[in-house]
């Protein structure tokens, strides 16, 4: 029956439930948002609280009052309810049902089985093809109304007997408020059509039950397996009954009998019931009883017939109802609504080109697509054209494992760093690209690894698959059916997610671009589940594992499932909470429906048990969070700690060697006297030196000091020892006397006649181009023995937090002046194309500290002018600031 109700308000016509469902299924956050996310619930028509009258509207615009319809009435069951007086048509329906029952008992063996199977398929075809054809013609041309009128059902003059019979039949089925003569012809035609539907639906149901009974068998399995099989079957039957009953409670007879093909209903919408549990519940979970009966009968033929009938029902939805919805209500609103980013500083909001999604929108001229095609062909050929040996199987499983691990690690790591620090976007901005360029590169990488993880998994399953020798006995047929079902569920889930989220959500756009408003709209599949990909997103892997029946494929499926859960738990969920905060939904449709059903059934859970479950759940979450935090902390600190360990080890070895030298030189240094050495930084009143400014150092030493003495510049803290320098100066040193170290004598500005004092100037390459605390060290002869040290001083660089171009240009000019001595600060169009690589590196290093932005040194030379570089900085800061603004805006509203 129809999976529709009505969309309604006080001035617009109502649409079917299936219509509402379709029109609301638009728009992967961003997973909640993979911006991933949407929700509306299905609807029911509710009578006005002040008046029981419901209004209908015909296609011609006529408004009429509908007869009273008791909410608990099940009109279709009145046909076989012996407590309800029977009309002539009821007797016809009951007679056809009894004829099938009689046919069941007068036949036996294979004749009965195939006869009942034929009866069932006859009525199923009558439903999906017969009723489908009638509704198709009614939707396009109002043909059902024309045919009924043309046959004389409502023609009192020319067909008085048929008229009176129709009148009595319809009035017997309706409330006393029903007025046959004054009701619109569309409404009366709908009532006549309902009688034909009753015949088909009741006979379809009864013929299925008889067919299942005819094929009943007792498979060879242990007693416990029989208990599980039959118990699960009855549970599915009970669940199916509840779905049908609750669906009728929600949609009533109007949508049950496809009323919106004949007229529209006006009313108020309420979103509840089974329509929050699953998409198209009347056509999806509404047929769970088929599979329950298949389990009870233990017959593969019943299962096969059930699958065919269920697929036919989906075809009815696809070719009859959905086109009617699109034609009647339009399909524009059913398209996925893109979450557009904030203004990206005069950049186009979204690229005009169509992104490759799996292999859709494939472009042979796009390098990333060509790479995807070549890798795909290579991985397929590698499996198909190799012998079916253990080595070839290991190779197939190995490449599937590698691609799964690569996809999961890259997926999780990149998104995690992007969510927290915008590392991916910053990387591309540092190379002169935009935020859209960063997102575009991510989309190509994500689609490549995603496709390869699926392709290699399929090929591994193919390599490990063995064609069954017997489909009837054992679990071969069942495994294949269940596996294909899982694969179909996976495909449906993925398509639904993409339809709901669009390109922006599918490719995690809210990780890379700021959305217009951090608010979630739950539609489509997301109105039933918060994270459908959590389990259904890996269903195909389990399906292929069942079909292949290989432990290695089961392992790969488990790996895929665990990695998906891990990314959702440790990457997507924290990101969603960071962006959307209180906007996240507490309960999904499924959870809400189950809770409501539990409350209605007066099922209470002991308080102690609730508290125990809550404690266990919170403990598990705490352990998971702590484990994730520890792993993340290890990954963040492992690199620096290893570098620090190597540095300390090297320094220790050097220190031990230099101690030996110190012992040898100790008598000589004592003879010279450390107190006779002095080192002073010129003009150091506040111990601060501007970034890039030359530093003059005054020194004095005994008259008999070594001519090979030298002065080095070091970061404070790099050398724990005050007597021996343990780290390299990396070229930042100066001789104290000329003609000794020819390459480091240019910095000498003054040398006293006695050569016991002087001034050296550290500038250009001799400086540190990083803010921080530094000191000078005077060393004896050609070694690292420290004779004296200067006072520590700080190299300072002012930060600029503004995003305004003029402010940035003002802050940038002194930096350029420091990095390029002799430039004209007033010339904002100063050319930068001819500067050296070292000078460009200094500039980008200064920009990193002053503006908190990282650029590649080539960007400076590409921009060519200070003004252009300032605009690039302003643009980059605005892009990155837009993320912070969207986060802070959500926090303020939370």
Swiss-Prot record:
Cytoplasmic topological domain residue ranges: 112-113, 217-222, 290-299, 388-394, 469-470, 560-894
Domain of life: Eukaryota
Membrane topology classification: Multi-pass membrane protein
EC numbers for this chain: 2.1.1.17
Compartments in which it is found: Endoplasmic reticulum membrane
Lumenal side: 1-90, 135-195, 244-268, 321-366, 416-447, 492-538
GO biological process, one term: phosphatidylcholine biosynthetic process
PANTHER family assigned: PHOSPHATIDYLETHANOLAMINE N-METHYLTRANSFERASE
Protein name: Phosphatidylethanolamine N-methyltransferase
Taxonomy of the source species: Eukaryota, Fungi, Dikarya, Ascomycota, Taphrinomycotina
